């Protein structure tokens, strides 16, 4: 869920608005930082700029979600037999945190029979839909907050542009339709 960036921003904005409880470990955040730096290098950023921007992202997440950091998960790492041992830390952190879901588009590496009962493995698109359908007003607030944060380094984005990006890049059409309905409510004939 923490990759790619617009999807991450939307899902974290939902958490910030109170739509769900976001939890992560330092190991997860370290992966985000490394992947963000690699992405920026591939886009042509200078190494020191890529590293600084990636570090800023991780630091900002630690600050904004300081009560979401899961600790003491290490003892469970390696005890689930997941197909990719590098994903064990994600499941271990979810178990320790009492999470109800792991949001990932890497579904094949979290076979249901290897995941403890009570933890659902769900795609980012499905999670966004479930979350916004339960709290449409928080979905709208999340996108509005994203829009307000734009314009510092790049052109500002309207809510409609962010919704279009969520549709086009992440297939979140069902989710964005709920939000659009709040923006443009239809009136019943009467």
Where are these regions (language model features)?
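Acidic, metal-binding active-site segment of PIN/NYN-like and related structure-specific nucleases
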Residues: 87-121
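Short, basic, glycine/proline-bearing loop/turn elements
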Residues: 66-80
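PIN-domain endoribonuclease scaffold, especially VapC-family toxins
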Residues: 27-70, 149-165
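Acidic, PIN/NYN-like endoribonuclease modules and their adjacent C-terminal/linker elements
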Residues: 108-190
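Short, well-structured N-terminal submotif of metal-dependent ribonuclease cores
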Residues: 1-26
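Conserved nucleotide-binding/hydrolysis micro-motifs of P-loop NTPases
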Residues: 1-2, 28-29, 108-110
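A generic structural signal for alpha->beta connector loops
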Residues: 19, 66-67, 118
């Amino acid at each position: 869920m923490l990759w790619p960036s617009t999807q991450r921003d939307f899902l974290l904005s939902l958490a910030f608005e109170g739509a769900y409880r976001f939890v992560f470990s330092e190991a997860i955040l370290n992966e985000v930082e490394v992947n963000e730096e690699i992405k920026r290098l591939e886009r042509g950023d200078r190494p020191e700029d890529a590293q600084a921007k990636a570090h800023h992202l991780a630091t900002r997440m630690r600050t904004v979600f300081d009560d979401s950091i899961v600790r003491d998960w290490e003892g469970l790492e390696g005890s689930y037999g997941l197909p990719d041992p590098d994903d064990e830390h994600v499941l271990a952190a979810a178990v320790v945190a009492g999470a109800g879901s792991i949001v990932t588009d890497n579904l094949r590496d979290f076979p249901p029979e290897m995941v403890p009962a009570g933890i659902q493995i769900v795609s980012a698109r499905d999670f966004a839909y479930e979350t916004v359908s339960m709290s449409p007003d928080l979905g709208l607030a999340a996108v509005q907050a994203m829009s307000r944060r734009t314009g510092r380094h790049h052109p500002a984005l309207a809510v409609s542009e962010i919704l279009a990006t969520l549709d086009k890049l992440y297939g979140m059409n069902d989710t964005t339709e709920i939000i659009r309905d709040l923006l443009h409510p239809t009136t019943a004939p009467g």
